[in-house]
């Protein structure tokens, strides 16, 4: 995590240094850049957490209805040295789970579909994986990375715009360059996200003593997502699968939530490049190695 933070800070530092160089040593501009970046990341973090929970209709997980899950999360949290996160349950339409928030104020959401298909040990592996994300501050790190990507893109736009003749051609060039730079930084952030998934898998394996339960859980989740995607395609072919609000993946989850979940359905080469998760088969192979 220290290396990841250092690299993200390097991107941010380069952006601020470039703004300082091109716009002059103006204390006001520098102050606005720093304050604006902090506010941007903070807003993204707060709004992102709220939207993720709201989009799946997450509700507090009743301890009387799910006593074992509460006990296991409390035990695993204690072993990982973190405060027990808030537990929520949701009807996602697919078997999955995700974590939001930071260490000391985290939330783990588990779909009812996941609870229905997993054995106790398999569910323990999933819970340990999500707790690892909270313990390692992965969600906060990814939000920070996305915020820095936006800042770097904005700085690149203004550099192109103000270093030219400030005409219409420069305006469109600035947009293209800014989006391209932001995309390139985002690719790096996504690579970090895929790496952190492997780390969370390894932490979960250590927490429960074996990687086999989580490997089986990932297989079942992958199968469940594929079945849901197939049903969605069938509904679409019959004309009943028109998208309502926002852009959604074939599994029916908002893309923002899908990025947080333990498993992602991305399969094509391009999807793998811009995916937040590594291929499920590789994760299973590592867990069983």
UniProtKB/Swiss-Prot annotation:
Residues 222-250 are annotated as: Disordered. One of its GO terms (biological process) is proteolysis. One of its GO terms (molecular function) is zinc ion binding. It is a multi-pass membrane protein. It is an enzyme of class 3 (hydrolase). It is found in: Cell membrane. GO terms for cellular component: plasma membrane. It holds the Pfam family Peptidase_M48. Binds 1 zinc ion per subunit. Residues 235-246 have a biased composition (Basic residues). Zn(2+) binds at residues 129, 133, 197. Its cofactor is Zn(2+). The keyword Iron does not apply. Its EC number is 3.4.24.-. Keywords: Cell membrane, Hydrolase, Membrane, Metal-binding, Metalloprotease, Protease, Transmembrane, Transmembrane helix, Zinc. The chain crosses the membrane at residues 3-23, 28-48, 144-164, 172-192. The active site is at 130. The keyword Protease applies. Belongs to the peptidase M48B family. This is Protease HtpX homolog. It comes from Halobacterium salinarum (strain ATCC 700922 / JCM 11081 / NRC-1) (Halobacterium halobium). The gene is htpX.
